[in-house]
Amino acid sequence: MNHRISFRLMEAVSGDTLEVFLDERLSFKENFKMLKSLCEKDYTKAEVYDPYKKVFLDRNTSLSEFGFQGFVFLKLFL
């Protein structure tokens, strides 16, 4: 996981919405897996959504229905 993202999450409080920039060195699929793992493991009540499609990411979201435009928003419910 990107250390910058981890650090920002550690300082976040419940209800915060963080802008998360995707790692350009990773493929679309790798970025998707990284964000999905945030929701499923570290922050089980987090929601990630594409600001253009307004689709929330959870453990049932498939790669084909989710598109990234360079960044997403992560909202925490701790």
Regions found by a protein language model. Give the residues of each.
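Ubiquitin system architectures
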Residues: 1-78
